Amino acid sequence: MDGIHDTGGMTGYGPVPYQKDEPFFHYEWEGRTLSILTWMHLKGISWWDKSRFFRESMGNENYVNEIRNSYYTHWLSAAERILVADKIITEEERKHRVQEILEGRYTDRKPSRKFDPAQIEKAIERLHEPHSLALPGAEPSFSLGDKIKVKSMNPLGHTRCPKYVRNKIGEIVAYHGCQIYPESSSAGLGDDPRPLYTVAFSAQELWGDDGNGKDVVCVDLWEPYLISA
């Protein structure tokens, strides 16, 4: 899906605001949102690609309005939709809780059970522990050093292929095994592992004469996006 979320190579957004000694969370609810997402991850609820698709499909105006408030607003909206779509909660339950909060009636923040400190440490360790994401899948069609061309496409669903590399020629510089294919995962069709590569593009291939001849941009791209150059 092409939309306002895919801003690679675009200009006119102004300076990136910088806050010295910025806190991890500006509001308490942001930390609680991250806790919800961590819980979903530990429970095996597939949400990375689904959440991206839900955020992308909310419409450009809503996307901008939410992100002006807090980036975590995006994450919370997506988490709610995934929990409903996966039938973990009902839409009626979601609406009821939102209404309670809006009316100031939701005040019970005590956990329903006592937390095990060891479980918390395990969750933190799992988040930071390096590990391979490769899964069993098809043999790769390309090798290191191969010249490839990114397909010209205009997908209606979720994709991890940015607009600025489409129809451009690059070189395979790394292979990462077969990994979860975002197009399938975001649509609830399972992991569907496909070969994943890092492709290097010269800045001039991407930006023409405006590109610096010494610069290279590397992008991770799945095999279905690519054809031989």
Swiss-Prot record:
It is an enzyme of class 4 (lyase). SUPFAM superfamilies: Electron transport accessory proteins. Industrial production of acrylamide is now being developed using some of these enzymes. Keywords: Lyase. GO terms for molecular function: nitrile hydratase activity; transition metal ion binding. Its EC number is 4.2.1.84. Belongs to the nitrile hydratase subunit beta family. Heterodimer of an alpha and a beta chain. It comes from the Bacteria. NHase catalyzes the hydration of various nitrile compounds to the corresponding amides. This is High-molecular weight cobalt-containing nitrile hydratase subunit beta. It comes from Rhodococcus rhodochrous. Induction: By cobalt and urea or cyclohexanecarboxamide.
